[in-house]
From Swiss-Prot:
This is Mediator of RNA polymerase II transcription subunit 4. The gene is MED4. Residues 246-258 have a biased composition (Low complexity). One of its GO terms (cellular component) is core mediator complex. The lineage of its organism: Eukaryota, Metazoa, Ecdysozoa, Arthropoda, Hexapoda. Residues 164-208, 234-258 are annotated as: Disordered.
């Protein structure tokens, strides 16, 4: 029956037995008893003492085993935490992969739908113009919810912006009429036509008929027509167009004078 008890309980029972035997020996020492009874009590005490020592050795072994088990439990807890971290990482990866697969399936479905029902680029451009005419993609930095202004710049704000000012500076810049700004071939053509039209004039000198035919103003070119002095405004959109027009006018004037 003692085998079903724990080591602690068995040790406590042995201590109780040794205590009872010791009390019996002390009581019998004051009384006259036979030597055989005394020897039996002593033998029983020695047997209980040996059993108690064996139980102590067993308890020490069990304590060592318990210490090893505690170390193993600590290692198990460490590995358990690592496993939990890995499990969490796997769950996150599973969530990301499932989301990516879902989005990929949606994209494949949209691609298949687009292949079945293609849309021309003209319709896309029309749709983009329709969106741009009614909506916008950005708002001013100071705009907030409840602001009465539109969340996109107006035409006046666009003209007052940096792009509008830069365009005004380009279109409204001062244009000077210099021979150095013309290509060398056109300068030679203009000089040759002027020399042939002057006749008796000095070589290389521009005649009076060709002087003051071009008046250059800001962003505008005026050409004098004949002796009447009427001027016609010409657009100065590109420097090449102005140079070609000046060369053609010089050639026509020289042919008229001849």
């Amino acid at each position: 029956m003692s085998f079903h008890l724990s080591t602690k309980e068995r040790l406590l029972l042995l201590i109780d037995d040794i205590e009872m035997i010791a009390k019996e020996l002390i009581e019998q020492a004051h009384q006259k008893i036979s030597s055989t009874e005394l020897v039996d009590l002593l033998d029983l005490l020695v047997a209980k003492d040996e059993e108690f020592r064996k139980m102590l050795e067993l308890a020490e072994e069990q304590a060592k085993v318990e210490e090893a088990m505690d170390q193993l439990r600590a290692k198990v807890e460490v590995h358990d935490r690592e496993i939990q971290k890995l499990q969490k990482s796997l769950k996150d990866a599973e969530l990301i992969l499932s989301t990516a697969i879902f989005q990929a399936r949606q994209k494949l479905a949209s691609i298949n739908q687009a292949n079945k029902r293609p849309v021309s680029s003209e319709e896309l451009i029309k749709y983009a113009h329709r969106i741009s005419s009614a909506n916008a993609v950005s708002a001013p930095l100071t705009w907030c919810i409840g602001d009465l202004r539109r969340p996109y710049p107006t035409d006046i704000e666009m003209r007052n912006g940096l792009l509008g000012k830069s365009e005004q500076n380009i279109n409204g810049g001062t244009v000077t009429h210099q021979n150095s700004g013309m290509p060398s071939e056109q300068q030679r053509t203009l000089s040759g036509s002027a020399g042939s039209g002057s006749g008796s004039g000095a070589g290389g000198e521009v005649p009076n008929a060709f002087q003051n035919q071009f008046n250059w103003n800001l962003g505008e070119l005026h050409m004098t027509m004949g002796a009447s002095g009427n001027t016609v405004a010409l657009e100065t959109r590109a420097q090449d167009d102005v140079e070609v027009m000046s060369t053609d006018s010089s050639s026509s004037s020289s042919s008229d004078s001849q």
